[in-house]
């Protein structure tokens, strides 16, 4: 084993995540597996153990190692954090920049981002549950949501590049544009279970989603005639509909 000392503010690249039960502090015993209570005549089991996430990271020197997720902060602009809706930004990636002479910030070349977002919770079997693209409105001088893919079980990395649409036939398709790709768990994949020893999270069947940013529009890149594969959802669609109905009341 080898330990590396990092300075506060050092930049790190997230490579892979693992999740394990949080160690019990010295002198304390793990809570016994007893019934937590009875609700509507049904016995409830003990609560699951508290989990702790670890990330395999790489620093600027090329050194790699595991680091506790709770002591890291994602390097995301404050302008995006305010739109996070109480969720944690897992990654923010620049797609392109637009020039706005009247932008409130000092740098008038404003970056546009694709972000991966997830709950503030350890022990999840996915890295993020939402992808959002933020474009800059040069008339209103603010960020706006141009695209959102939510209720997904997504996995890093998010890859960004300039690329053409290999399936398109228009001049717009032939021109390189900011393109991003990420993987989500397939609807017919088995439930992901972290390795009990290493905590490694290895999804089964995944779907590669690829999109292009064309101006302020985000369009999926798909081969013609190919059916869109179904993706797994961390929250069942029926549960979401019921929740929306309750809010309307």
Enumerate the predicted regions with their spans:
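Acidic, small-residue rich beta-repeat scaffolds with periodic aromatic anchors
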Residues: 38, 43-46, 80, 135-249
């Amino acid at each position: 084993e080898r330990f590396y000392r990092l300075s506060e503010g050092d930049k790190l690249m997230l490579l892979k995540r693992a999740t394990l039960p949080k160690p019990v502090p010295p002198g304390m015993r793990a809570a016994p597996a007893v019934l937590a209570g009875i609700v509507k005549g049904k016995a409830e089991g003990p609560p699951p153990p508290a989990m702790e996430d670890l990330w395999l990271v790489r620093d600027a020197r090329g050194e790699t190692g595991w680091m506790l997720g709770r002591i890291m902060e994602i390097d995301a602009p404050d302008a995006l954090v305010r739109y996070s809706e109480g969720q944690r930004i897992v990654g923010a990636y620049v797609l392109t920049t637009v020039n706005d002479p009247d932008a409130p910030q000092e740098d008038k070349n404003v970056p546009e981002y694709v972000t991966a977002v997830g709950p503030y919770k350890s022990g999840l079997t996915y890295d993020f549950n939402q992808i959002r693209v933020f474009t800059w409105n040069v008339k209103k001088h603010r960020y706006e949501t141009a695209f959102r893919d939510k209720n997904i079980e997504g996995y890093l990395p998010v890859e960004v590049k300039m690329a053409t649409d290999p399936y398109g036939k228009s001049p717009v398709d032939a021109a390189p544009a900011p393109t991003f790709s990420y993987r989500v768990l397939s609807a017919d994949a088995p439930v992901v279970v972290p390795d009990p020893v290493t905590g490694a999270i290895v999804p089964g069947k995944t779907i590669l989603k690829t999109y292009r940013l064309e101006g302020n529009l985000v369009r999926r890149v798909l081969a013609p005639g190919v059916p869109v594969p179904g993706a797994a959802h961390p929250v069942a669609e029926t549960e979401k509909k019921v929740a929306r109905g309750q809010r309307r009341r």
